[in-house]
Design a protein with these regions (language model features):
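Aromatic- and glycine-enriched glycan-recognition loops and surfaces
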Residues: 48-66, 93-116, 181, 185
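Catalytic domains of carbohydrate-active enzymes, especially glycoside hydrolases
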Residues: 55-81, 195
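Bacterial N-terminal signal peptides
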Residues: 12-21
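Active-site-adjacent "subsite" loops/lids of carbohydrate-active enzymes
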Residues: 32-50, 123, 128-194
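Bacterial Sec-dependent signal peptides at the C-terminal "C-region" and cleavage site
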Residues: 20-33
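Aromatic- and acidic-residue-enriched segments that line the glycan-binding/catalytic groove
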Residues: 83-95, 129-165, 204-236
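Aromatic-lined substrate-binding rim segments of carbohydrate-active enzymes
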Residues: 78-126, 237
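Hydrophobic faces of well-ordered beta-strands that scaffold small-molecule active sites
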Residues: 37-41, 71-73, 121-123, 200-202
Length: 237
């Protein structure tokens, strides 16, 4: 047993050890606070406003003042047109009467001014989007109509997505190897052009929804993958 005369000394020693342990825990290295607030700059809604470097600086400062630490800049629209001088994709050089020259480097200004203010700047790309059905504009209307999704309608019909004017998204068929190769080349080009961007965000990296794609190509791919011949297409899907 413990001698009763030694108990106060033991209790004091244990209490001292407890205090030291607590202090060690409290003195863990401080971590830099991470700002998870993102401001998204849509390329169509802000086309006119962001066509001037001083406007970009102005709204970046307002963004920072509001407590945001990150900005996302749309650089490839749902039409498949890009907002930088690409050697692959068509350039979005105008929108609703406002024009831009190909040498206008919008994201370059965002990166320069944003980094000066301590903001992180990300570029956003709409990957499998290729047309704006409300404006009949985009690569599915011009360069590559054969790449658009085929939609299975409630009435049983199969319709190109460009003909569905209640849906503004003119989506491509992600299962088409030509589409995937084309998009991959754009992503590589973009990453190499903007190495100082803090990251790339992929938007619409998907099918339009469960009603697409029902093209002959997708049917062939499904049957090859599953080993099943679909006798009643698309009813049995």
């Amino acid at each position: 047993g413990i001698n009763i005369m030694k108990k106060p000394a033991i209790i004091t020693a244990l209490f001292a050890i407890l205090i030291i342990c607590c202090q060690c825990t409290m003195k863990s290295p401080e971590k830099e606070a991470v700002n998870h607030n993102y401001m998204w700059f849509d390329c169509e809604a802000n086309y006119a406003t962001l066509s001037h470097p001083d406007s970009i600086r102005f709204y970046l400062q307002k963004t920072k003042d509001l407590g945001f630490g990150n900005v996302v800049v749309d650089m490839k629209s749902i039409m498949g047109e890009v907002l930088y001088d690409s050697q692959i994709a068509p350039y979005m050089g105008d929108w609703e009467g406002v024009e831009r020259s190909r040498d206008y480097d919008m994201l370059g200004y965002f990166i320069e001014y944003g980094h000066e203010m301590g903001l992180k700047v990300f570029g956003s790309l709409n990957v499998f989007a290729g047309g704006h059905n409300f404006f009949n504009r985009g690569i599915i209307y011009n360069e590559h109509p054969e790449w658009q999704s085929i939609v299975y309608r409630p009435d049983g019909s199969l319709v190109p997505i460009s003909e569905i004017k209640t849906n503004y998204n003119g989506m491509l068929n992600p299962s088409n190897p030509e589409v995937r190769e084309y998009q991959k080349n754009i992503l590589v080009e973009f990453a190499e052009r903007y190495p100082d961007a803090d990251g790339i965000i992929f938007d619409r990296l998907r099918y339009d929804n469960i009603t697409s794609d029902f093209s002959p190509l997708s049917r062939e791919q499904f049957e090859a993958w599953s080993g099943i011949t679909v006798e009643n297409y698309p009813e049995d899907i």
